[in-house]
A protein has these predicted regions:
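Bacterial N-terminal signal peptides that target proteins for export
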Residues: 1-10
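Hydrophobic/aromatic beta-strand elements that line small-molecule binding cavities or substrate pockets
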Residues: 77-79, 91-96, 108-111, 125-132, ...
């Protein structure tokens, strides 16, 4: 009888431990929803308190913005006055890491000098990297965008991508080594032909962002835009970060593009993500030339 009781208590204990472990597992879908909710609160704060106040509230202390190169976002917005500038945006695509602490979203944006203006004077797309903070809040780690023509089609609905469960745990150091090796191969290939290099390492649904164009989604759609700006490209990385689950990463920095018309200098930003086989793929590519003086 005593042995039976001990076995029963041991079984209950192991069951409770199992349930606690399962409860502690990160939920990427729930995290993606929280991230998108933070994005919408970011926008709502801008509508209620002003764009400057919104950026200062939702940027991480080390968050990056591009003006045109990478700068500390809080320092940039802290120096700007609140002008009434009206910035409207809505996330239409979101992706989350397996560790549920690191994700990104993107979508259309439009702006005007203030709400008194009848028409919006500019249209574009934003891309934001979000990271979960120690206090459980979500903050913007990096924010950038492009300008494009005024859209004429129906507004997109939100699409959310989260990774599936792995059969075996991922070793962080091994994944980091694989990421660095993959990106090194990409940069070497780009020195010969940037378009071919991008398509070679791209995910099937890569998103390519260039000023003056709507985002190109998918290899076939991206090919003409990549070909139009192709050249012999060299990269100088200035910053990078990766999720704790080692399945989502970004890099940014400077580039030099040698083309027939001359050499173009600019800044780049890329998001890399592992596929089902654990191979690193380029899922988002943004590049912007430095404005001519």
């Amino acid at each position: 009888m005593q042995l039976h009781r001990r076995s029963l208590w041991l079984g209950l204990f192991l069951l409770s431990v199992s349930l606690c472990v399962r409860a502690a597992e990160p939920d990427p879908l729930e995290a993606a929803r929280a991230m998108v909710d933070a994005e919408r609160k970011f926008y709502q704060t801008g509508q209620e308190q002003g764009t400057r106040a919104a950026f200062l509230a939702f940027l991480a202390d080390d968050g990056i913005v591009f003006r045109p190169g990478p700068l500390n976002g809080k320092e940039v917005w802290g120096k700007r006055p609140e002008t009434g500038f009206d910035l409207v945006w809505e996330p239409t695509f979101a992706a989350m890491s397996r560790s549920a602490d690191f994700g990104y979203d993107t979508g259309p944006a439009k702006w005007r000098a203030n709400k008194k203006e009848e028409k919006f004077t500019g249209h574009g797309q934003f891309v934001s990297i979000w990271k979960k903070q120690k206090d459980g809040s979500w903050k913007v780690a990096l924010d950038l965008g492009i300008e494009n023509p005024e859209p004429t089609g129906k507004p997109e609905t939100l699409r959310t991508i989260v990774p599936g469960k792995l059969k075996e745990p991922v070793n962080f150091d091994t994944a980091e080594k694989s990421r660095l090796e993959t990106q090194q191969k990409f940069t070497q290939a780009a020195r010969t032909d940037s378009a071919l290099a991008t398509l070679k390492f791209a995910a099937p649904e890569i998103r390519v962002y260039r000023d003056g164009h709507f985002p190109s989604i998918g290899k076939d759609a991206a090919r003409p835009l990549l070909d139009a700006t192709a050249g012999r490209v060299t990269f100088e990385m200035l910053g990078a970060d990766m999720s704790r689950s080692a399945d989502l990463s970004y890099t940014y920095g400077k580039y030099s593009n040698v083309r027939r018309k001359g050499t173009e200098q600019g800044h780049y930003f890329q998001i890399w993500q592992t596929d089902a086989a654990g191979t690193w793929k380029l899922v988002l590519d943004w590049a912007q030339p430095v404005p001519e003086k």
